[in-house]
Amino acid sequence: MTASVLLHSHWIDPVMFLYENGLDERNKNMEGFTGSNFPANQCRNLLAHPTSLAPNTTYTSNDVPISGIGEPGKQCSPCPATQSSPNASLPYGYFGSSYYPCRVSHGSVKACAQPSGYGDKYMDSPVSGEEFSSRAKEYAFYQGYSSAPYQPSYLDVPVVPALSAPSETRHEPLLPMEPYQPWTITNGWSGQVYCTKEQPQSNPLWKSSLQGNSGVRRGRKKRVPYTKVQLKELEREYAANKFITKDKRRRISAQTNLTERQVTIWFQNRRVKEKKVVNKFKSPS
């Protein structure tokens, strides 16, 4: 990136600086000129303000070029650290960028800061409350994305001239946030995702299919013991033959008032019971 810098009056031609990506090359080019009164920090400040400077090394922040804004004539207050501190940071702008870093606090806005990606750290500079009130009328802060390196615990917001009159006061928040909207649950909940014991639940699909027939029970049926007459008839048929035929099953079902399935299951259980009794007597223990 190239930037033209106008020095003292005896310097006629502008001096061009070419900055490479390496840190050593930038530090070498940022040194003060031999035979002049410009220290290294003033060379950095000149790059931030490409406008003409007075012969004495003091300057004021004039029209700062901002991309996309068609209202010239806005002036910003100079940073006091550029004249008092030898390690002063850049007053405004990242070498011609349209975004300006400002540290935002509850009480007042502190001085402008330079990102550490250019070799310097943030330096604090006091700013009076009157200066902040006048500056707040000229500039409005909007949240955006800056091309500068990210600095933890600092808030970088772009500064653009206010479109309204200087006397008007902007009541917008510095960082607008979307209001919280709770989830919309269509199941009758009260806006929050939680379950309570008293919450009414809709009937499942499998339960709705059984509502028409109230006689159908879910799960295992209740055990109904056989009567003595039924057991006597079953034992008599079992003594005659341990295995039941189809015709015999129908006849026993008609006599005992039991279903054919019940008769078949009883004969199966009776054979298993007899087998257990026989095995128990056969075992020596």
From Swiss-Prot:
Q: Which GO terms describe its cellular component?
A: nucleus
Q: Which CDD domains match?
A: homeodomain
Q: Which residues bind DNA?
A: 219-278
Q: Which Pfam families match?
A: Homeodomain, HoxA13_N
Q: Which UniProt keywords apply?
A: Developmental protein, DNA-binding, Homeobox, Nucleus, Transcription, Transcription regulation
Q: Which GO terms describe its molecular function?
A: DNA binding; DNA-binding transcription factor activity, RNA polymerase II-specific
> By its UniProt entry, which PROSITE patterns does this protein fall under?
HOMEOBOX_1, HOMEOBOX_2
Q: Which InterPro entries match?
A: AP_axis_regulatory_Homeobox (IPR051003), HD (IPR001356), Homeobox_CS (IPR017970), Homeodomain-like_sf (IPR009057), HoxA13_N (IPR022067)
Q: What is the name listed in the Swiss-Prot or TrEMBL entry for this protein?
A: Homeobox protein Hox-A13b
**Annotated source species:** Takifugu rubripes (Japanese pufferfish)
